Amino acid sequence: MSGHPGLTTHVLDTARGKPAAGVRVQLCRVTGDTRTPVTEAVTNSDGRTDAPLIERGSLKQGTYELTFHVADYFKGFVAAADPPFLDVVTLRFTVGDTSGHYHVPLVMTPWSYSTYRGS
């Protein structure tokens, strides 16, 4: 995995069968009750951020939160509820092996979501 970045994400809209462009993503490091902002990005036309959220050499062990602001994305579609059912989706996960690549995608519809550790 020597060429892989440390932490990346990808947002897929399975209701429309497309990558979700324009979703604001925030990354925080969590220590106890404290959330420290690391970076913020917006997904591109492929549903990915233009750069890794954390480069491989900068990834540290610990707990992180990815927060996806999905309500604004779903407001643009007639099929979505008004107001949208999902507003913000937060995924909390732990990094143990900093030599690996952590790809944490969000797979969503206007009414549900899922995630997994991808490659």
Swiss-Prot record:
Q: In which pathway does it act?
A: Purine metabolism; urate degradation; (S)-allantoin from urate: step 2/3
Protein residues bound to substrate? H10, R48, Y116
Q: Which GO terms describe its biological process?
A: purine nucleobase metabolic process; urate catabolic process
Q: Which UniProt keywords apply?
A: Hydrolase, Purine metabolism
Q: What class of enzyme is it?
A: hydrolase
Q: Which InterPro entries match?
A: Hydroxyisourate_hydrolase, Thyroxine_BS, Transthyretin/HIU_hydrolase, Transthyretin/HIU_hydrolase_d, Transthyretin/HIU_hydrolase_sf, Transthyretin_CS
| Any one GO molecular-function label of the UniProt entry | hydroxyisourate hydrolase activity
* CDD domains referenced in this protein's UniProt entry, alphabetically: TLP_HIUase
Q: Where, if anywhere, are coiled coils annotated?
A: none
Instruction: Report the catalytic activity.
Output: 5-hydroxyisourate + H2O = 5-hydroxy-2-oxo-4-ureido-2,5-dihydro-1H-imidazole-5-carboxylate + H(+)
Q: Briefly state the protein's biological role.
A: Catalyzes the hydrolysis of 5-hydroxyisourate (HIU) to 2-oxo-4-hydroxy-4-carboxy-5-ureidoimidazoline (OHCU).
Quaternary state and interactors: Homotetramer.
Q: What is this protein called?
A: 5-hydroxyisourate hydrolase
* Species in which this protein is naturally found: Deinococcus radiodurans (strain ATCC 13939 / DSM 20539 / JCM 16871 / CCUG 27074 / LMG 4051 / NBRC 15346 / NCIMB 9279 / VKM B-1422 / R1)
